[in-house]
């Protein structure tokens, strides 16, 4: 990376930081429920429909169930439509899930919202590290992919801080709603980021793939990356 010029360094930093918001969304969704659950139960008690322990457990676990579905969908979706649209799809799911929480006045609606958020989390867990791994140089790949865990942990911490600040006012819906800020930033930010060069190459957009690589690689690194992508493409074809 020492041979990269300033513009390439800026592009790498921008791409990894922006896409890393997916990790923040992931972590926030994991952490926010810990502070919100007591307020949610209080809301339903006041409405005359207190949640049973089973229902509370289902609300906690719905994200895991949705996450399983999301991870199963993410791979085929990323291969067929691209890494970039798949990340944007996760953002749409986050928006939909939060929208349902804003409207939730029943256990079923709240459970559905958590399932939708879980699907978003599962997609992010696959698509974001995949995109980062394919956009940066091989020599720095491990370091940048590991940043996803840093962003995820930051998201959990952020959720705890938000919970601490809002719990006294009983604003459990706002606890969830605040994640819309990084979600919207990620969604619209992805419009300006390029598609993964590996996906472009594998789908016949060779010139565009080379252009994207040159945004974040030196010419020598680009040649090595193209060779790696081409070899992997032949291996993938051979496996079928």
Predicted regions and their residues:
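Transmembrane-helix signature of 12-pass secondary carriers
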Residues: 1-240
């Amino acid at each position: 990376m020492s041979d990269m010029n300033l513009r390439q360094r800026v592009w790498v930093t921008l791409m990894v930081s922006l896409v890393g918001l997916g990790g923040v969304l992931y972590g926030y969704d994991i952490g926010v429920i810990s502070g919100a659950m007591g307020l949610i139960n209080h809301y339903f008690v006041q409405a005359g429909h207190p949640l049973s322990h089973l229902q509370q457990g289902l609300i906690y676990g719905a994200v895991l169930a949705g996450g399983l579905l999301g991870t199963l969908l993410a791979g085929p979706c990323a291969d067929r439509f691209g890494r970039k649209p798949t990340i944007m799809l996760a953002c749409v799911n986050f928006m939909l899930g939060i929208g349902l929480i804003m409207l939730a006045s029943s256990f079923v609606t709240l459970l559905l919202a958590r399932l939708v958020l879980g699907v978003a989390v599962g997609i992010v867990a696959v698509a974001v590290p995949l995109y980062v791994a394919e956009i940066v140089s091989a020599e720095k790949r491990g370091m940048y992919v590991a940043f996803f865990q840093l962003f995820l942990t930051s998201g959990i911490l952020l959720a705890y801080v938000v919970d601490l600040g809002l719990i006294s006012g009983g604003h459990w819906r706002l606890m969830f709603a605040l994640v819309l800020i990084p979600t919207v930033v990620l969604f619209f930010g992805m419009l300006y980021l390029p598609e993964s060069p590996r996906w472009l190459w594998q789908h016949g957009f060779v010139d565009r793939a080379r252009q994207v690589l040159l945004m974040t690689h030196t010419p020598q690194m680009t040649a090595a990356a193209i060779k790696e992508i081409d070899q992997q493409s032949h291996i993938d074809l051979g496996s079928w």
